[in-house]
C-alpha cells in the first residue's frame, strides 16, 4: 500500500483550477503552494491518496465550486470540503469559534472510514490548531507549516504604531499565537521555507524545537514559468491591451509588483519612492498587479485602505500615464506578464515588510526577470542561491530608491541576473525536486512514528449500555443543585435509564468523588473523569484507564511546573495535598484576575513544559499535561466506545466550562450559570435553560 496523506488548509478560497489569488487577504500564495504540493504529491508513485480538507462555503458572492463537498484534483487527489461555522464566506479571523467543530468532524470521518493517513500536514495557524487536536486524539504524526506567523505579525504591527487592542480586535492575534504554540507542541516535524524563518521567527515561540525543523523551499512549475525572448503574438496583444489604458509608453522597462492589496506587502511605499524619483519615472513604468476587483469600495477594509493610498499617491505625484493598476487579469496571464516585463529589461520588485518565502520571486526569476526585493525573510535564501538581483531595506526609503535606480542602470548586469535566475530556479527550486525532497524527509523523520490510534483494551468492560451519555459536574452543578430528587427520579426511570448513561466530571480523587457522590443517591455512573481530566475510572473499578494515562503523560514534568510557577507566589498558592495528583498541580488564586491564566500559560511555554493551565470558578487553577483536559477525556471515551459526539450531553455552568461546550457535543447551561458562558448563546448545540430544573429541561430534547 502506498502513502496516504492529509493536508489541512481551512481559510481562503481554494479549488483545483482558476485560483482566485489576490481576491482577498486570505487567498494568497499559501493557497497556491498547498494546491501545487498536493498535485505534486499525487503524481508520485509511492503515494496512494492525498486529501486536502478545507471549508464548505455556500455563498452567492463566491463561485458554487466552493460548495462542492468533494472535488477531484486527479485520480488519487481530492479536495474534501466540510461544513463548519457560517455557511457564508468569512475572513479567517472569524473562524476561531468553530475550529473545534471541524476537528471533531475530521476525527469522526477518519474513524468511520477506518483509513488513516500516514501523516497530517497543517497549513497556517488555524489548521495547526485543528491538526493538533486530530493528531492527539488519533495518534497521527503532525507536520506543521505556519506560512505567516502571529508573533511576527504582532511585532511588525506594533512597530508601525498600531495599538495592541486594535490589533487584537482586527486579527484575533492572541488566538492565532496560542494556536501556533499548540501546533508546535504537537508537531513531529516543522517545515519551513528558509533558515531565517526558522531561526528568527519560529524561535520566538516557547514550544519551538529546532530539532523538529526541516527547510524545504517551495517549487515553481517550470512548465508555466519559463524564459522566452517573446510571448506569442496573442499574449503580447492581450497584455498591451491590459496596460495601454494606463501607460503612455509601453516599451519603457517596467518595475513590476505582483501581490495582494494588504498592508504587509507595502505597495504604497513603492509608489512613494517612484513618485519622488525623477530618474525612476524617466526610465521606468510602474505596473501593479494587486488582485482583481470590480469596485474597490466593496472590498474588505484593509484592501480598500491600500487602494485608497494607491489612488491618492498616483494623484499626489501626478503619475498618470506612468503607473498601471488594472482591475482585472487572468491567473494564466501571470507567466506572460513576467515575460512581457523581462522582454523590456524590467525588474520585479517585492517591497513587502516581511516575506516568509517569496514564491513570486521564483516565478519572476524562472521567466528571466531580475528582482529588487525586501531583505526580510525568504528572499535572502533565494538570492543567495540564484544571484539574480538586489536585497534592500524597504523600511529605508532612500536605500530602497537607490537600489532600484542602481539595478535599472546597468544592462550588462541585468543580463547576468536574468540568466542566473533562470538557471538558479531550475537547479534549486523545481516542484519535482521539492516533492521528492519532501517525501524523503517525511519518511525518514516519521518512520519511527507509525500511527498508533487508540488501543481499545477490554472494551466490553468499559462500554456503557446506553446509546447516549450525560456528563454532570460533581464539584459545581451537583454541589449546588436543588433538584437532585427530581433528577434522581428521572434517571431511575427504566425507559430513560436503558437509553442514557451517566458520567461524572470532577477535580477530586476517585475516592473523594465516590464519597461525595454517594450523598446524592443518584444512579451509579458508567464512568468517572477525575482529577481535572487526568484520570478515568469505569463504574466500580478502582484502577484508572492506563491507555488514557499513557497518552497524556508524554513529557509531563510535575516538579518543573511547581518550580516555574513558584515565582508567581504573590498571585497563586498551592492547594493542600488532598487536592494534588500525579498529573495535576492545583493552585488557589489569592485574588481573581483575568490576567493570571495568560501569565501562567506564558511561563509554562517559555520553559518548554508540556503543560496546560485551566482556571475554574475564577479561583481554582489546575495545571495538567498538555494533552489532558475534561473535554479531551470525553473524546477519548467516545472513540473507545464508538459513540458519536452528538450522543454526548454535558452540563456546563461555571467559568472554565467553555472547553466542554466547544465542538460537536451537546450542552445544557442552567439558568444560574456564570456569565462567562453567555458567548455561546448563538451555538445551535447549546441549550440555555431558563428553568430552575435546568438539566431536566434540557433532557427533554436529548
Which positions does each model-derived feature cover?
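Catalytic cores of nucleotide-sugar-dependent glycosyltransferases that transfer UDP/GDP/TDP-activated
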Residues: 1-362, 366-450, 454
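Structural alpha-helical scaffold elements that stabilize or flank donor/cofactor-binding regions
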Residues: 113, 183, 341, 463, ...
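Short beta-strand scaffold positions
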Residues: 122, 144, 192-193, 373, ...
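Asp-based phosphoryl-transfer active-site loop
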Residues: 465-483, 661
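Active-site phosphate-binding/coordination module
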Residues: 486-577
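Substrate-recognition/cap helix-loop segment adjacent to the acidic, metal-dependent catalytic center
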Residues: 508-527, 591-612
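Substrate-recognition "cap/lid" segment bordering the active-site pocket of phosphatases
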Residues: 531, 537-546, 550-551, 612-645
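Mg2+-dependent phosphoryl-transfer enzymes with acidic/Ser/Thr/Gly-rich catalytic loops
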Residues: 624, 631-702
Amino acid at each position: 500500500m502506498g502513502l496516504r496523506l492529509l493536508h489541512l488548509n481551512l481559510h481562503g478560497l481554494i479549488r483545483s483550477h482558476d485560483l482566485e489569488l489576490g481576491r482577498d487577504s486570505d487567498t494568497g500564495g499559501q493557497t497556491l503552494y498547498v494546491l501545487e504540493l498536493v498535485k505534486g504529491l499525487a503524481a508520485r508513485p509511492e503515494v496512494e491518496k492525498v486529501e486536502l480538507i478545507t471549508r464548505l462555503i455556500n455563498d452567492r458572492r463566491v463561485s458554487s465550486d466552493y460548495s462542492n463537498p468533494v472535488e477531484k484534483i486527479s485520480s488519487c487527489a481530492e479536495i474534501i470540503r466540510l461544513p463548519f461555522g457560517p455557511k457564508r464566506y468569512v475572513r479567517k479571523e472569524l473562524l476561531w469559534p468553530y475550529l473545534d467543530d471541524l476537528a471533531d468532524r475530521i476525527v469522526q470521518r477518519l474513524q468511520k472510514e477506518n483509513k488513516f493517513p500516514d501523516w497530517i500536514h497543517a497549513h497556517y495557524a488555524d489548521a495547526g490548531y485543528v491538526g493538533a487536536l486530530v493528531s492527539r486524539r488519533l495518534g497521527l504524526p503532525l507536520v506543521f507549516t505556519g506560512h505567516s506567523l502571529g508573533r511576527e505579525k504582532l511585532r511588525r504591527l506594533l512597530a508601525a504604531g498600531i495599538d495592541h487592542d486594535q490589533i487584537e480586535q482586527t486579527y484575533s492575534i492572541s488566538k492565532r499565537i496560542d494556536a501556533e504554540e499548540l501546533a508546535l507542541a504537537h508537531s513531529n516535524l516543522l517545515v519551513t521555507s528558509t533558515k531565517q524563518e526558522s531561526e528568527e521567527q519560529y524561535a520566538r515561540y516557547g514550544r519551538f524545537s529546532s530539532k523538529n525543523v526541516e527547510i524545504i523551499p517551495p517549487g515553481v512549475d517550470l512548465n508555466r514559468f519559463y524564459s522566452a525572448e517573446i510571448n506569442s503574438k496573442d499574449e503580447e496583444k492581450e497584455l498591451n491591451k491590459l496596460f495601454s489604458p494606463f501607460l503612455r509608453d509601453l516599451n519603457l522597462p517596467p518595475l513590476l509588483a505582483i501581490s495582494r492589496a494588504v498592508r504587509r506587502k507595502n505597495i504604497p511605499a513603492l509608489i512613494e519612492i517612484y513618485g519622488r524619483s525623477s530618474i525612476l519615472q524617466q526610465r521606468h513604468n510602474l505596473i501593479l498587479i494587486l488582485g482583481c476587483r470590480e469596485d474597490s469600495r466593496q472590498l474588505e477594509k484593509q484592501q480598500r485602505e491600500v487602494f485608497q493610498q494607491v489612488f491618492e499617491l498616483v494623484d499626489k505625484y501626478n503619475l498618470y500615464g506612468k503607473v498601471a493598476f488594472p482591475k482585472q487579469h487572468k491567473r494564466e496571464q501571470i507567466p506572460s506578464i513576467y515575460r512581457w516585463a523581462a522582454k523590456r529589461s524590467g525588474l520585479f520588485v517585492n517591497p513587502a515588510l516581511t516575506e516568509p518565502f517569496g514564491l513570486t520571486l521564483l516565478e519572476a526569476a524562472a521567466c528571466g526577470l531580475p528582482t529588487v526585493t525586501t531583505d526580510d525573510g525568504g528572499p535572502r535564501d533565494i538570492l543567495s542561491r540564484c544571484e539574480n538581483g538586489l536585497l534592500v531595506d524597504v523600511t529605508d526609503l532612500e536605500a530602497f530608491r537607490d537600489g532600484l535606480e542602481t539595478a535599472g542602470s546597468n544592462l550588462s548586469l541585468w543580463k547576468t541576473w536574468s540568466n542566473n535566475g533562470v538557471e538558479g530556479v531550475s537547479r534549486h527550486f523545481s516542484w519535482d525536486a521539492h516533492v521528492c525532497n519532501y517525501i524523503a524527509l517525511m519518511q525518514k523523520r516519521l518512520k519511527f512514528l507509525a500511527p498508533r490510534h487508540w488501543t481499545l483494551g477490554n472494551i466490553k468492560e468499559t462500554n456503557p449500555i446506553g446509546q447516549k451519555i450525560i456528563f454532570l459536574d460533581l464539584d459545581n452543578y451537583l454541589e449546588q443543585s436543588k433538584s437532585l430528587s427530581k433528577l434522581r427520579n428521572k434517571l431511575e426511570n427504566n425507559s430513560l435509564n436503558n437509553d442514557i448513561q451517566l458520567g461524572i466530571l470532577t477535580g477530586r480523587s476517585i475516592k473523594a468523588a465516590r464519597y461525595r457522590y454517594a450523598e446524592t443517591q443518584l444512579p451509579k455512573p458508567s464512568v468517572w473523569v477525575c482529577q481535572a481530566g487526568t484520570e478515568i475510572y469505569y463504574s466500580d473499578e478502582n484502577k484508572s484507564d492506563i491507555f488514557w494515562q499513557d497518552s497524556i503523560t508524554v513529557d509531563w514534568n510535575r516538579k518543573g511546573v511547581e518550580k516555574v510557577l513558584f515565582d508567581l507566589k504573590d498571585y497563586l498558592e498551592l492547594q493542600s495535598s488532598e487536592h494534588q495528583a500525579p498529573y495535576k498541580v492545583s493552585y488557589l488564586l489569592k485574588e481573581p484576575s483575568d490576567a493570571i491564566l495568560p501569565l501562567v500559560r506564558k511561563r509554562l511555554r517559555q520553559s518548554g513544559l508540556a503543560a496546560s493551565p485551566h482556571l475554574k470558578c475564577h479561583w481554582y487553577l489546575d495545571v495538567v499535561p498538555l494533552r489532558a483536559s475534561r473535554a479531551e477525556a470525553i473524546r477519548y471515551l467516545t472513540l473507545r466506545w464508538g459513540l458519536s459526539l452528538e450522543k454526548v450531553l454535558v452540563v456546563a455552568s461555571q467559568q472554565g466550562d467553555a472547553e466542554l461546550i466547544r465542538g460537536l457535543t451537546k450542552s445544557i447551561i442552567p439558568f444560574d450559570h456564570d456569565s462567562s458562558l453567555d458567548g455561546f448563546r448563538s451555538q445551535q448545540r447549546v441549550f440555555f435553560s431558563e428553568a430552575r430544573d435546568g438539566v431536566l429541561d434540557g433532557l427533554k430534547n436529548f
